[in-house]
Each structure stands twice: as C-alpha cells, then as structure tokens.
Amino acid sequence: MKSKFEASIDNLKEIEMNAYAYELIREIVLPDMLGQDYSSMMYWAGKHLARKFPLESWEEFPAFFEEAGWGTLTNVSAKKQELEFELEGPIISNRLKHQKEPCFQLEAGFIAEQIQLMNDQIAESYEQVKKRADKVVLTVKWDMKDPV
C-alpha cells in the first residue's frame, strides 16, 4: 500500500525547486552524515527508489531522470547483457566541476535495480566520470545465468 507521500508524488512534479537546495542535501549533508559509507549507501538508495518506482522498460529511464532532476540520460549502446548510458546536463556539469570525487551511485543503483526487476537476473551498474567530456557514463551488466 502506498503512503500518502507516494500517492501524492505526481503533484510534486509540478513544483519547481532550485538545484541549490537539492545539492546541499545530496553533496553536503548526506556525505557528512554517512561518511565513508556515502557511496555504497547512495547505490542502495538508488536500488530502493527503483523498487518504489518500477518502470516498464529501459526506454523510460530518460523521462524518469528528467523528472527526478538527475540530468539528461541518453542510451548510447545496447548489447545482449549490457546497456550503456550517458548522463549530462547543468547539474552534472556543476558537480563535475566543483566536486573532487563526484558520486553518481544513486543513479547507478537505480538503473541496476530497474534492469534486475525487468530481467529477473542479477544486475550491477557502475559509473565512469568523464570530466573532460562533461558527462558520466553509466554501464549496467547482467548475467543470464544468474537469476534473482
């Protein structure tokens, strides 16, 4: 059963919020609170969000990323057991420019769990930060011999 917040989530899409508030929480508060566990906790948070907001296909990822304010996601390759995406946009550029070690594990975990839910196979995702190209590459892989 959905909580009242989850039931009203669609209404939140219409409210505009500045990136400053979002980045304060994501890039200052959470790393300070979680310390060395920040990266792994963000990955698991992404997986948790994917279970709360399951999508029908990976083609829906870009729209979700836009609505969530995570940036512009583009599929760049699709293989039998691997998908590769590029994540870019103003919020990504800012993070790449000003963070010594920017973390995109929330997005990686979200993609991994979505693929795992869709394929019923264990999936893992990882990030590659491309500072010069001003983008992040997110790769998800799964093994057909490794069912959930």
From Swiss-Prot:
Domain of life: Bacteria
Family annotation (InterPro entries): DUF2507, NO_sig/Golgi_transp_ligand-bd
Gene3D superfamilies: Trafficking protein particle complex subunit 3
Transmembrane segments: none
Protein name stated in the entry: Uncharacterized protein YslB
Organism of provenance: Bacillus subtilis (strain 168)
Name of the gene: yslB
